[in-house]
């Protein structure tokens, strides 16, 4: 059975990505208020369009240049929640920059996600 061209499995994946991004955003805000992070710009409300955009990227051949609110987009491209937390907390295992880049400036060499600068 399909809904607007999407299978039940595809819709569950989309919902899971949107939900994960929202919960990640909420947790990052809590950590910021606890003094465990130093910068956060929320992405809540942007998730659906970011997931839709991410699903139309050819992973492995297309390059992406996300801006600071595109957390759901990066999740859709294959970044994990753990990798996004490593970036947010500026940890050495952060795939974006080994903890040297400003948080919310996503990058991932293996996924062709190019980090921005500010």
Model-derived segments and their meaning:
Residues 1-39:
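Cofactor-/ligand-binding subdomain signature composed of acidic, glycine-rich
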Residues 23-118:
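Cofactor-binding active-site loop characterized by glycine-rich and histidine/acidic residues
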């Amino acid at each position: 059975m399909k809904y607007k061209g999407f299978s039940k499995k595809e819709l569950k994946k989309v919902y899971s990505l949107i939900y994960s991004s929202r919960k990640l955003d909420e947790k990052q805000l809590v950590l910021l208020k606890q003094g465990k992070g130093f910068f956060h710009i929320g992405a809540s409300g942007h998730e659906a369009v970011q997931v839709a955009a991410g699903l139309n990227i050819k992973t492995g051949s297309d390059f992406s240049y996300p801006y600071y609110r595109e957390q759901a987009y990066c999740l859709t491209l294959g970044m994990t929640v753990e990798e996004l937390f490593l970036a947010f907390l500026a940890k050495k295992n952060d795939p974006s920059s080994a903890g040297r880049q400003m948080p919310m400036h996503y990058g991932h060499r293996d996924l062709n996600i190019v980090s921005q600068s500010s």
